[in-house]
Each structure stands twice: as structure tokens, then as C-alpha cells.
Amino acid sequence: MPAFNRLLPLASLVLIYWVRVCFPVCVEVPSETEAVQGNSMKLRCISCMKREEVEATTVVEWFYRPEGGKDFLIYEYRNGHQEVESPFQGRLQWNGSKDLQDVSITVLNVTLNDSGLYTCNVSREFEFEAHRPFVKTTRLIPLRVTEEAGEDFTSVVSEIMMYILLVFLTLWLFIEMIYCYRKVSKAEEAAQENASDYLAIPSENKENSVVPVEE
């Protein structure tokens, strides 16, 4: 099992690399919504294009709304990165892709005051010969910042299952030991009874029980 657990991540990476090389696709993965104070937090925003070969002018706008407040612009991508004046100034980092399908940003040194609702607006104007359609997508990320990292539910369940398995194996081994001990004890008792019965036979019967050998 340990060897299998070590090989599984490697096999997954190889499979992902093979899929990305042979079948380049865009997957819209949702962003994480919990961060720990003092760490960096990636706000993931992915807006896939159905026709990647079509050229498009892309504009990205990131907004932040504190609890009980209003939305205000904190980051903008328009022909290049542009961090606007806001309480996040100096703590935002572009983390997107060259094709602008991944337009994520990273918040550095997250604070408790960074909790709130983040909005990612992606506006695209496609350049066709006959017309120039305009498409806009929006992603909402409710972020909650905590002082300490909470326990992962999956790891807790895995730990509980591990302890249950250890208890089960211990009980099974204990039962097997008792079964083997009783089996050996019964075999020894049977051997002792046979020996006692043989010793209890009179010597005359022992001599008579000897079969004469004809010459």
C-alpha cells in the first residue's frame, strides 16, 4: 500500500501531462474560498474560450466587496497588468496565463480584513470578419480568512479510518492467536491421553498384542 500511494501521484501527473499535450483543453476549476492569515491566497478565475483560434480583445476586472460594503475595483488587465489604487495595492500579483483563459490573481500576506466577496469580470470582444461579438463572464469568490488553518475533513476521515483498521487488525490477530493456542493445546492433550492409555495397558496384554512372526 505505501508503494501504491507513492506511485499514484506520479501516475496522476503523467496522465495530466499526457492529456494536456495530446488534448489541450481548458477546465473551469472553482477557486478555494478559505485562506489563513499571513499566507498567500490565489483567487482562481478561469474563463475558457470555445474557439481558441479566434483572436479576441480581453479585459479583466477584479472587484472586492467587504461585508456590508460596496464593490470597488482592485485590479485591472487591459493591454497589460494594472493594479489600481486600493487597500490591496502592493499585495496583488497577476497569476494568469498567456492566452488569458486563466485570469487569476494572488493576494499576498492575507489579513482578516480581506474577508469578503471577490468578483472577476472577463470581457471579450471577438474579431470575426463579419461581426465583432462581445461576451462577458463573471465569477464570484466568497473568501473567508481565519487566524489558523482548520483541519481538513478528508484528512480527519482518513485518520479515523486508519485507527478503525488498526483496531480491526489487532482484534483479528488476537483471535487468530487464541484459535491457534487452543488448537495446539487440544493436540497436546490428545497426545497425552493416547500416551496415558498406552501406559495403562497391562504388560501381559502388551506381550499378547505382539504378533508372532513365523520363521
Curated annotation (Swiss-Prot):
Name of protein: Sodium channel regulatory subunit beta-3
Stated role: Regulatory subunit of multiple voltage-gated sodium (Nav) channels directly mediating the depolarization of excitable membranes. Navs, also called VGSCs (voltage-gated sodium channels) or VDSCs (voltage-dependent sodium channels), operate by switching between closed and open conformations depending on the voltage difference across the membrane. In the open conformation they allow Na(+) ions to selectively pass through the pore, along their electrochemical gradient.
Residue spans, topological domain Extracellular: 25-156
Transmembrane region(s): 157-178
Residues with attached carbohydrate: N95, N109, N113, N121
Gene source species: Mus musculus
Cytoplasmic side: 179-215
Assembly and binders: A voltage-gated sodium (Nav) channel consists of an ion-conducting pore-forming alpha subunit functional on its own that is regulated by one or more beta subunits. Forms homodimers and homotrimers. SCN3B is non-covalently associated with alpha subunits and induces the formation of alpha subunit oligomers, including trimers. Interacts with SCN5A/Nav1.5; regulatory subunit of SCN5A/Nav1.5. Interacts with SCN7A/Nav2.1; probable regulatory subunit of SCN7A/Nav2.1. Interacts with SCN10A; regulatory subunit of SCN10A/Nav1.8.
SMART domains noted in UniProt: IG (SM00409), IGv (SM00406)
GO biological process, one term: cardiac conduction
Subcellular location: Cell membrane
Keywords assigned: Cell membrane, Disulfide bond, Glycoprotein, Immunoglobulin domain, Ion channel, Ion transport, Membrane, Signal, Sodium, Sodium channel, Sodium transport, Transmembrane, Transmembrane helix, Transport, Voltage-gated channel
Keyword Signal: yes
Endpoints of the signal sequence: 1-24
Entry's family note: Belongs to the sodium channel auxiliary subunit SCN3B (TC 8.A.17) family.
